[in-house]
Amino acid sequence: MIHQTGFWHKDFAEPHHIHSPNVSKWICEFLSDKKNNQIYDFGCGLGNYLNDLHSNKFTKLIGLEAEPPKTDYEFKINSQNLAHPFILDEKGIVICLEVGEHLPKEYQDVFLDNIANNCSDYLITSWAIKGQGGYGHYNELNNDEIIPEILKRGFTYLPEKSNEVRLVVEDFCSYFRNTLMVFKKD
């Protein structure tokens, strides 16, 4: 089901992953002038957000998932445990939704360092707040706890953009209204 480092085994992931079409549309519009930039989705699950980007003519897309799903997408989903250090061949924009809270606290720094070391532009992320609950939430943190952790890794928080994306969230994934955050790499 859920690995000790927080990733979901693929058979467990399929029925439990939630995709927000409104958030995905917002991401496509927000990044509309970055269609030829490298974009990664860390902990991409089934690859739904990347698939929406691909449908909107984004060209350089790679998903990272510890146990990649079998798909017929025209982009790659590579096997990568986010709790272990890694450097990708090219830095890029990073999307990382509903991932950090699934890693036990002991892997938090490596996970955040992986994001920082592989991001060259925007980071669009979320982190479940304390008390939110959810399958395999080992490390829920309030915004005022996780934002400084990301800032100290060379990012600037973009509160206006964060609030903008939170406003489009559908009711079935209302937790995103408290957890979505947008950053820019310094």
Regions found by a protein language model. Give the residues of each.
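Short catalytic micro-motifs in class I SAM-dependent methyltransferases
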Residues: 97-102
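Short glycine-centered segments of the SAM/dcSAM-binding site in methyltransferase folds
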Residues: 121-124
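Conserved N-terminal segment of class I S-adenosyl-L-methionine
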Residues: 1-91, 95, 106-118, 129, ...
